[in-house]
UniProtKB/Swiss-Prot annotation:
Top-rank lineage group of the source organism: Viruses
Name of the protein in question: Latent membrane protein 1
Family statement drawn from the similarity comment of this UniProt entry: Belongs to the herpesviridae LMP-1 family.
Organism field: Epstein-Barr virus (strain Cao) (HHV-4)
Transmembrane annotation, as ranges: 24-44, 52-72, 76-96, 107-127, 140-160, 164-184
Record field: compositional bias (Low complexity): 251-322, 375-384
Gene, per the UniProt record: LMP1
Length: 404
């Protein structure tokens, strides 16, 4: 499942919404200026228009609010601009109801009730948006109280029919919407990174390097398997903690090395992450008969306890280490050869740490007599090349002898 998610190509990101055209901004600014002039003319005039004058000035103020939202925060046109547009339609409906009679009046009242319910629903939706943006309960309560206070003051203005009171009510509505805009400007998701990088997913360049490494080393897979696991189907000569210069911590199931492939389809018996492996190297289970890798930090050995505090360079389950083993521990020794072309340390870890039995019950690794000699003089075959004259690996096999 994880491999499917890693191998799936990322979906194409949605292009960000660009700024509005200069012509649309110019038209909006012109309409905003005209609306402000008409609003000031209506409010400051000596007309005795009564309640209709209050509704006309309030409708112009709603148009001004919608234009301000369009110019400065177009992303809020859906919730906040829609709320202002519905309030504008309800205001125009009230102006029409003033001259309706009979059945048309009842129909207008029904439409007015439906419009008020729709405004209430959009207001609840807008409060949910504020809640998701991090608004506290007290902030939401303050917005609700300010909204209902503005409605009550508008009703009072309809009864008073005074120009100065209408001016104060309209400015209160403008301040309410501007306060919401300012709050969302400082608390909204601004400058979000749509291409969020997940550190658990492999880098595309790393995936390319892994595939090229696999294609280059497929021809040496059989010889590599014989050198590390010995002739025949017997147990391997040494565990993965001795590493090889040709291997690498790519942590993928297709690696031809015996380092750490972490997948059940590996061609080797080193670390395929399953309790049914024919070897005792790394079956990722606490009931293994060896002390190699039981996936627990309390193991008596220093091989692979899956913790970042291990003193060895064996396998602490991380692909970012400067060595060829895969240890992911902050206390690992520095790389031996920084000039390695693969970016790793270019060589196996300290053999004295891995070959010597550090008081654990693991014992020496599996060994062979090296060709039928004295059984008390075993040799270990290390590396990935078969003979010293192989052009693929100039280092050749490394032999290490144990003496009684």
């Amino acid at each position: 499942m994880e491999r499917d998610l890693e191998s799936a190509p990322p979906s194409a990101p949605r292009p960000p919404l660009g700024p509005p055209l200069s012509s649309s901004i110019g038209l909006a600014l012109l309409l905003l200026l005209l609306a402000l002039l008409f609003w000031l003319y209506i409010v400051m005039s000596d007309w005795t228009g009564g309640a209709l004058l209050v509704l006309y000035s309030f409708a112009l103020m709603l148009i001004i609010i919608i234009l301000i939202i369009f110019i400065f925060r177009r992303d809020l046109l859906c919730p906040l601009g829609g709320l202002g547009l519905l309030l504008l339609m309800i205001t125009l409906l009230l102006i029409a109801l003033w001259n309706l009679h009979g059945q048309a009046l009842y129909l207008g009242i029904v439409l007015f009730i439906f419009g008020c319910l729709l405004v209430f629903g959009i207001w609840i939706y807008f409060l949910e948006i504020l809640w998701r943006l991090g608004a506290t309960l007290w902030q939401l309560l303050a917005f609700i109280l300010a909204f209902f206070l503005a409605i009550i003051l508008l009703i009072i203005a309809l009864y008073l029919q005074q120009n100065w009171w209408t001016l104060l009510v309209d400015l209160l509505w403008l301040l309410l919407f501007m306060a919401i805009l300012i709050w969302m400007y400082y608390h909204g998701p601004r400058h979000t990174d749509e291409h969020h990088h997940d550190d658990s997913l492999p880098h595309p360049q790393q995936a390319t390097d892994d595939s090229s490494h696999e294609s280059d080393s497929n021809s040496n897979e059989g010889r590599h398997h014989l050198l590390v696991s010995g002739a025949g189907d017997g147990p391997p000569l040494c565990s993965q903690n001795l590493g090889a210069p040709g291997g690498g911590p790519d942590n993928g199931p297709q690696d031809p090395d015996n380092t750490d492939d972490n997948g059940p389809q590996d061609p080797d018996n080193t670390d395929d992450n399953g309790p049914q492996d024919p070897d005792n190297t790394d079956d990722n289970g606490p009931q293994d008969p060896d002390n190699t890798d039981d996936n627990g930090p309390q193991d008596p050995d220093n091989t692979d306890d899956n913790g970042p505090q291990d003193p060895d360079n064996t396998d602490d389950n991380g692909p970012q280490d400067p060595d060829n083993t895969d240890d992911n521990g902050p206390h690992d020794p520095l790389p031996h050869s920084p000039s390695d072309s693969a970016g790793n340390d270019g060589g196996p870890p300290n053999l004295t740490e891995e070959v010597a039995n550090k008081g654990g019950d693991r014992g020496p690794p599996s060994m062979t007599d090296g060709g039928g000699g004295d059984p008390h003089l075993p040799t270990l075959l290390l590396g990935t090349s078969g003979s010293g004259g192989d052009d693929d690996d100039p280092h050749g096999p490394v032999q290490l002898s144990y003496y009684d």
